[in-house]
Amino acid sequence: MLKASVSNKARCYFWWHLLLKSGLLLFICMVLGIVFLASPKCFAVDNGSLQLNPNVITNSDGGVGTTSDFSIRSQLFTPTIDKLAKEQAHDNVPKQRETLDFSKQAINTLYNANTKKVVEQLFVNYKPQVIASSTSTSDSKTMIWYWVILLAAVPLIVLAIFLGQKNAQRRLRKKNERTH
Protein backbone atom coordinates (compact mmCIF):
# COMPACT_ATOMS: atom_id res chain seq x y z
CA MET A 1 0.00 0.00 0.00
CA LEU A 2 1.47 3.33 -1.04
CA LYS A 3 1.12 6.30 1.24
CA ALA A 4 1.08 9.74 -0.26
CA SER A 5 3.44 11.97 1.63
CA VAL A 6 3.16 15.71 1.42
CA SER A 7 6.09 17.78 2.52
CA ASN A 8 5.70 20.60 5.00
CA LYS A 9 6.77 23.06 2.33
CA ALA A 10 3.97 21.95 0.02
CA ARG A 11 1.47 22.05 2.86
CA CYS A 12 2.55 25.59 3.84
CA TYR A 13 2.40 26.66 0.21
CA PHE A 14 -1.14 25.28 -0.06
CA TRP A 15 -2.38 27.20 2.99
CA TRP A 16 -0.56 30.36 1.95
CA HIS A 17 -2.02 30.13 -1.56
CA LEU A 18 -5.49 29.47 -0.13
CA LEU A 19 -5.26 32.48 2.18
CA LEU A 20 -4.02 34.77 -0.58
CA LYS A 21 -6.56 33.48 -3.08
CA SER A 22 -9.47 34.08 -0.78
CA GLY A 23 -8.17 37.41 0.47
CA LEU A 24 -8.55 36.17 3.99
CA LEU A 25 -4.96 36.93 4.94
CA LEU A 26 -5.28 40.51 3.75
CA PHE A 27 -8.55 40.90 5.61
CA ILE A 28 -7.13 39.46 8.85
CA CYS A 29 -4.02 41.66 8.67
CA MET A 30 -6.03 44.82 8.06
CA VAL A 31 -8.50 44.12 10.86
CA LEU A 32 -5.70 43.32 13.31
CA GLY A 33 -3.83 46.45 12.25
CA ILE A 34 -6.87 48.63 12.80
CA VAL A 35 -7.60 47.03 16.18
CA PHE A 36 -4.01 47.48 17.36
CA LEU A 37 -3.89 51.05 16.10
CA ALA A 38 -7.13 51.80 17.91
CA SER A 39 -5.64 50.75 21.23
CA PRO A 40 -6.50 53.41 23.85
CA LYS A 41 -3.28 52.92 25.82
CA CYS A 42 -1.36 55.75 24.23
CA PHE A 43 -2.52 59.03 22.77
CA ALA A 44 -0.67 61.96 21.32
CA VAL A 45 -1.53 65.03 23.35
CA ASP A 46 0.50 67.84 21.88
CA ASN A 47 2.47 68.79 18.81
CA GLY A 48 5.75 67.65 20.37
CA SER A 49 7.37 71.05 20.64
CA LEU A 50 9.52 71.84 23.65
CA GLN A 51 8.81 75.15 25.33
CA LEU A 52 11.58 76.08 27.74
CA ASN A 53 10.58 78.64 30.34
CA PRO A 54 13.59 80.29 32.01
CA ASN A 55 11.28 81.99 34.56
CA VAL A 56 11.02 78.66 36.35
CA ILE A 57 14.71 78.76 37.23
CA THR A 58 14.49 82.01 39.19
CA ASN A 59 10.88 81.65 40.37
CA SER A 60 10.01 85.07 39.04
CA ASP A 61 7.79 86.36 36.29
CA GLY A 62 10.04 89.03 34.89
CA GLY A 63 8.06 91.18 32.51
CA VAL A 64 9.29 93.16 29.55
CA GLY A 65 12.08 95.51 30.49
CA THR A 66 12.67 94.15 33.97
CA THR A 67 16.05 93.04 35.20
CA SER A 68 16.74 89.71 36.77
CA ASP A 69 19.05 88.85 39.63
CA PHE A 70 20.20 85.94 37.47
CA SER A 71 22.15 87.67 34.70
CA ILE A 72 22.64 84.66 32.44
CA ARG A 73 18.94 83.87 32.37
CA SER A 74 18.35 85.43 28.96
CA GLN A 75 21.15 83.34 27.44
CA LEU A 76 20.04 79.97 28.79
CA PHE A 77 19.37 77.23 26.25
CA THR A 78 21.26 79.05 23.48
CA PRO A 79 23.87 77.35 21.30
CA THR A 80 26.70 79.49 22.72
CA ILE A 81 25.99 78.43 26.30
CA ASP A 82 25.65 74.78 25.23
CA LYS A 83 29.01 75.00 23.45
CA LEU A 84 30.65 76.61 26.49
CA ALA A 85 29.25 73.93 28.81
CA LYS A 86 30.55 71.14 26.56
CA GLU A 87 34.01 72.73 26.40
CA GLN A 88 34.20 73.06 30.17
CA ALA A 89 33.06 69.48 30.63
CA HIS A 90 35.77 68.20 28.27
CA ASP A 91 38.46 70.35 29.93
CA ASN A 92 37.99 68.60 33.28
CA VAL A 93 38.16 65.04 31.94
CA PRO A 94 42.00 64.74 31.83
CA LYS A 95 42.29 66.16 35.36
CA GLN A 96 39.75 63.67 36.65
CA ARG A 97 41.58 60.79 34.97
CA GLU A 98 44.76 61.68 36.85
CA THR A 99 43.06 61.81 40.24
CA LEU A 100 41.28 58.45 39.91
CA ASP A 101 42.87 55.64 41.85
CA PHE A 102 41.12 52.29 41.73
CA SER A 103 43.68 50.54 43.91
CA LYS A 104 42.27 52.05 47.12
CA GLN A 105 39.55 50.09 48.82
CA ALA A 106 37.07 52.48 50.37
CA ILE A 107 33.78 51.70 52.05
CA ASN A 108 31.02 54.17 51.52
CA THR A 109 29.51 55.38 54.80
CA LEU A 110 26.05 55.26 53.29
CA TYR A 111 26.20 51.46 53.29
CA ASN A 112 26.60 51.51 57.06
CA ALA A 113 23.79 54.00 57.70
CA ASN A 114 20.61 52.77 59.31
CA THR A 115 17.85 53.74 56.88
CA LYS A 116 15.02 51.96 58.65
CA LYS A 117 13.63 55.19 60.18
CA VAL A 118 13.76 56.97 56.84
CA VAL A 119 11.96 54.15 55.05
CA GLU A 120 9.26 54.06 57.73
CA GLN A 121 8.64 57.80 57.36
CA LEU A 122 8.36 57.75 53.58
CA PHE A 123 4.91 58.71 52.34
CA VAL A 124 3.48 59.15 55.86
CA ASN A 125 1.89 62.53 55.14
CA TYR A 126 1.66 62.01 51.39
CA LYS A 127 -1.47 63.34 49.73
CA PRO A 128 -1.77 62.68 46.00
CA GLN A 129 -2.46 65.69 43.84
CA VAL A 130 -4.20 65.83 40.53
CA ILE A 131 -2.34 68.12 38.19
CA ALA A 132 -4.63 69.66 35.63
CA SER A 133 -3.74 69.11 32.00
CA SER A 134 -3.51 71.99 29.56
CA THR A 135 -5.68 70.08 27.09
CA SER A 136 -8.97 68.50 27.99
CA THR A 137 -9.69 65.28 26.15
CA SER A 138 -12.16 62.58 26.90
CA ASP A 139 -10.98 59.03 26.35
CA SER A 140 -14.53 57.78 25.89
CA LYS A 141 -15.16 60.21 23.02
CA THR A 142 -11.90 59.23 21.38
CA MET A 143 -12.69 55.53 21.74
CA ILE A 144 -16.10 56.03 20.14
CA TRP A 145 -14.40 57.47 17.06
CA TYR A 146 -12.01 54.53 16.90
CA TRP A 147 -14.91 52.09 16.91
CA VAL A 148 -16.83 54.10 14.31
CA ILE A 149 -13.78 54.08 12.04
CA LEU A 150 -13.29 50.35 12.65
CA LEU A 151 -16.93 49.58 11.82
CA ALA A 152 -16.70 51.67 8.65
CA ALA A 153 -13.35 50.22 7.59
CA VAL A 154 -14.22 46.53 7.87
CA PRO A 155 -17.03 46.60 5.24
CA LEU A 156 -14.84 48.73 2.97
CA ILE A 157 -12.03 46.19 3.25
CA VAL A 158 -14.44 43.35 2.46
CA LEU A 159 -15.75 45.33 -0.54
CA ALA A 160 -12.21 45.99 -1.77
CA ILE A 161 -11.34 42.29 -1.52
CA PHE A 162 -14.54 41.30 -3.34
CA LEU A 163 -13.98 43.83 -6.14
CA GLY A 164 -10.34 42.81 -6.45
CA GLN A 165 -11.30 39.17 -6.87
CA LYS A 166 -13.96 40.04 -9.45
CA ASN A 167 -11.44 42.15 -11.37
CA ALA A 168 -8.88 39.32 -11.28
CA GLN A 169 -11.48 36.81 -12.51
CA ARG A 170 -12.51 39.15 -15.33
CA ARG A 171 -8.88 39.58 -16.41
CA LEU A 172 -8.35 35.82 -16.33
CA ARG A 173 -11.49 35.27 -18.39
CA LYS A 174 -10.37 37.84 -20.99
CA LYS A 175 -6.90 36.31 -21.12
CA ASN A 176 -8.37 32.82 -21.61
CA GLU A 177 -10.70 34.09 -24.37
CA ARG A 178 -7.76 35.59 -26.26
CA THR A 179 -5.72 32.39 -26.10
CA HIS A 180 -8.57 30.08 -27.24
From Swiss-Prot:
Q: What InterPro entries is this protein classified in?
A: EssA/YueC (IPR018920)
The protein's name in its UniProt record: Uncharacterized protein CA_C3712
